[in-house]
């Protein structure tokens, strides 16, 4: 937890999910301060205030009095925003949380954007704004200086209107954009589509899906050794576009599939890919936006497939992967298996062996390893995820 003065208000802010030994990582950054210093709150006239990509709810807390709409593709960011509102005794009911797939309110007065990591997501958001902004809408964006590129400015210019950037302050920069009645090139397609090699499938990806334009090389390696003829329920945890679950669905005709991700666009892409490629199997599928396997019944899964991330936005961390492993252990039946693919340097083997009491390398190459851990009766009571671990992340 860290305390920060934003404008004239002091806030206690935490990253989410909470992490042990994370004192060096703050829930806010200089770009948040810089944005708030440059917003003229006197201009807000009761019309909607929109905040985009507010990772931990910092801007939403600071603008709470103006009943903001907080727009994000990340369910984790929504949980973080709600957490920090509660932490500061702010009324959650006056904040509207919107996903990246939701319609935006008309004629906003103020739009505050934290520049996202994916340029495609920024383009999607700017095009969505173009449909609702008014001529007097104030648009201001911010990010670390290293994340503001010519391509970023060109997107604002092309879609919304005249754009200028500020000098750097504490290694952060701002973008000011005026709404102009400019001709817009043809509408961008809602998804990027490409054929999946060695299959008859076509993969559809929304803007914020990892490896949007081609098959992730880790997923490609993983797909080569997915199991056949599993009975019971299989979870594609951190499913992305659902390509791993799609192949698992084909190879396991008696199984049910659960597609889970914290990205709204990822889950929407997964559902689109099953609908388009295997509509006959939709009745065997469930699609869920969630923080890991929260809400999934204990000991209800036979197999968990996972290609875990090793970063949270720009911060490199395997904490999210660890939470996924713990959730998998909690939700697997005794005898159920967790199969993961990961970069060799991440040393997931020893983490899984410590958590499950066993781990097997199924395949490896110069970059990736595919590992399997089995939930045994003896490991059943030794920790298990979702905040109730006997074994903590710091043990590793």
Swiss-Prot record:
Keywords: Cytoplasm, Methyltransferase, rRNA processing, S-adenosyl-L-methionine, Transferase
Catalytic class of the enzyme: transferase
Localization: Cytoplasm
Gene3D superfamilies assigned to the protein according to its UniProt record, in alphabetical order: Vaccinia Virus protein VP39
Any GO CC annotation of this UniProt entry: cytoplasm
Molecular-function GO terms, alphabetical: 23S rRNA (guanine(1835)-N(2))-methyltransferase activity; nucleic acid binding
Reactions mediated catalytically: guanosine(1835) in 23S rRNA + S-adenosyl-L-methionine = N(2)-methylguanosine(1835) in 23S rRNA + S-adenosyl-L-homocysteine + H(+)
EC number: 2.1.1.174
HAMAP family cross-referenced by the UniProt entry: 23SrRNA_methyltr_G (MF_01859)
Purpose: Specifically methylates the guanine in position 1835 (m2G1835) of 23S rRNA.
Similarity field: Belongs to the methyltransferase superfamily. RlmG family.
Name by which UniProt lists this protein: Ribosomal RNA large subunit methyltransferase G
